[in-house]
Amino acid sequence: MSTGIFGEQLPKHTKIEYIGDVPIIEECPRDIKTLNGEPVLLFGKWSFENVVVKDPGLRRYICLKPVLLPHTEGRYQKHRFGKARIPIVERLINLMMRPGRNTGKKHKAYNIVKRAFDIIYYKTGQNPIQVLVDAIINVAPREEVTRIIMGGIAYTVSVDVSPQRRLDLALRWITEGARTCSFNNPKPIEECLADEIIAAASNDPRSYAVRKREELERIAAASR
């Protein structure tokens, strides 16, 4: 038995394709699992069935594998490209545990996201999973800047952003926007998170994540 890029056991004659030294990431399985004949629903409410990732570049990295409870117990932590196998809602929950005093309080973060999804549905009437995916696609940056040194002089140059980093930055900015909104504000953080996701999904400039993406891409455009 050979081992896949995520540490899983592959059949004896399975062939892994590579581009150079980098293995090709396969899209996360989307089979709608059933439990006692019933479809698996996130939090017992939300279906993964008709959720569409419109950005081809992120399709292999946004994991929409149907789960009832988004908690993989860190099983992909040490695997290369393991983040691509973690359900996207769990990644949002994990980032809600940052920083400082919220570290490790996953049940608290779980309840925040669960209530935020209810608020998203009440405000939009749409599947919250689809709204989250649309928000991620809208705020994921396509280029950023990096520093290079030539002849002892440092320059900033524009570079394309890899799909995995695009997803990481999008989730980081969405959760940062929710925490920033709730700080010193009577509005609960779950409502702030819901408002941030809805604003990002509609590409609203009032969204913290949308402003961060525009700022980064503006700096990158000036460094071409």
UniProtKB/Swiss-Prot annotation:
GO CC terms in record: small ribosomal subunit
Domain of life the protein comes from: Archaea
Official protein name in the record: Small ribosomal subunit protein uS7
GO BP field: translation
Keywords: Ribonucleoprotein, Ribosomal protein, RNA-binding, rRNA-binding
Database matches in PROSITE patterns: RIBOSOMAL_S7 (PS00052)
Protein's gene: rps7
Pfam assignment, any one: Ribosomal_S7
